[in-house]
């Protein structure tokens, strides 16, 4: 018994300290560990992350099953996840549903188009008023300084909910960036991650403050040369860099975005002098002691024009270098001193910008001239300050307080209406191929009495000197002689202010000649005019000289000596406007301004050239920077002889008609 007792207590102790088996435990519920949060596409991007999020859309009036409009609201996001600051960000959004953009927060359309704007073919946005996106390294990860969120509201057509009208593409258009094809993250979101082009060396130092200046056909500098708390003085410099670009009677316009107004100007003037909008606006509440009668303009979008030469030395209005030339800006090849135009403005600011360093240039710049190419201008870009000679005469340079550059380039839209046209003629054909019907457009009132679609009719040489409205009898008689069927109604005129006749005057064994005549049918004179002609290379190889024009070969658009550049000789560089005929018997006929010269070509280097065909006629004609519309036809030769022999009776018939039109 004494031996069994310790064994009993030992077994009891073993059962007491041994835990029960799994089968003896009550059942437990296993809780799985939470899944990791999905990684955002932006977190995987080490460059510039772009996203386009469609928020909502709804049907809007009117009801139209063929072209139903819908409202859309979207958000465009630009996030800098890279190692360098993104200056002056530019993002292309490939709208594709005939969108009309109504509003965009914290951004502007780069080409200066005002809202609402047609953006159905895509558009480029730029940040405003904040245009630079800093890095996480610079800001310790402050997303407010790294991100731009643009809320877009507009109208699109024919994409009904629940379908989503996403753009075809989004991409960063800043130079040196590569963007892959966007990825559809969901039915409503499009994203892409843009990275630096490895072939471009970039200065990634944190101290880089301004972008380098960019080339363009025309550049505008906005230099703040004096800065005060409530106003500043700026110098605006327009410079032409295109050898075939120019401006006549330029008009410059822009938008003040912060209620600024122009107090004074020198070297230029607004087309409307009016301070009414200041008196009845917020400016009068701030500038209570200011006499607004001395303010030049309070227009939100003023139009600025150049001054006449008589104001050049005016101490109040002029006295600015490179001002006061009636708005003429020439190519450098003609006169470098006249390729620049300058004026100054004293700009009054509004709160909260009452600080010397609070400087904001106007936006949406546009510049145009009369019978000149169209320019598309980008937004102001902050660049390195401009240096200019010290006005005190000291041998030093002064720096502007701040400088912005606006780059403008010549554009040629498919729907653009030309402003000048060309007619063809040749020694081997007695008919003139006139400018095309409605070459420079036709107004709706004119279309009621003539045909805008019917090709223009051949005309006799005499008719080339007459305005279109005085050519009718001559044209009818001439086409009757040629046994041509006359259309009804007759074709409309070309409606061009300037026309150029290209006449092949001769073609012989050693060379050939062309006579060029420039006609000014408008009401504006053209001082310092120029004409540029581009032809096929074989013809240009034979160019020798022009007799009454100053002519030379010019290399443009990457070519070598591919353009004949012509201007008037001293005393012959003024193309006057159309004027009344001095002969009282012809008082109903207007006489165009006219300049003419013969151009000599050699066949020494081009023995196989066929000048009677396309080789002897231009591929492009440019007058004062504006490309002129060429005819659809070329003069035709008949058996190598002049075409269309005329009998004595035909001569009598024709000149009777010609005499009648002059009565």
Swiss-Prot record:
> This protein's superkingdom?
Eukaryota
Q: How does it sit in the membrane?
A: Lipid-anchor; GPI-anchor
Where is it located?
A: Cell membrane
User: What residues make up the propeptide removed on maturation?
Assistant: 639-663
Q: Which residues belong to the signal peptide in this entry?
A: 1-23
- Pfam families attached to this UniProt entry: COB_C, COBRA
Give me any GO biological process, just one. root epidermal cell differentiation
Annotated glycosylation sites = 63, 111, 121, 169, 203, 326, 355, 397, 409, 429, 470, 550, 561
Residues carrying the lipid (GPI-anchor amidated serine) are: 638
Please provide, in alphabetical order, the Gene Ontology terms of the cellular component aspect for this entry: plasma membrane; side of membrane
Q: What does the record say about tissue specificity?
A: Expressed only in flowers.
The protein's UniProt keywords, in alphabetical order, are:
Cell membrane, Glycoprotein, GPI-anchor, Lipoprotein, Membrane, Signal
What is the similarity comment for this entry? Belongs to the COBRA family.
What PANTHER family does the entry give?
Answer: COBRA-LIKE PROTEIN 7 (PTHR31052), COBRA-LIKE PROTEIN 9 (PTHR31052:SF20)
Q: What is this protein called?
A: COBRA-like protein 9
Which species is listed as the source?
A: Arabidopsis thaliana
Q: Report which gene this protein is encoded by.
A: COBL9
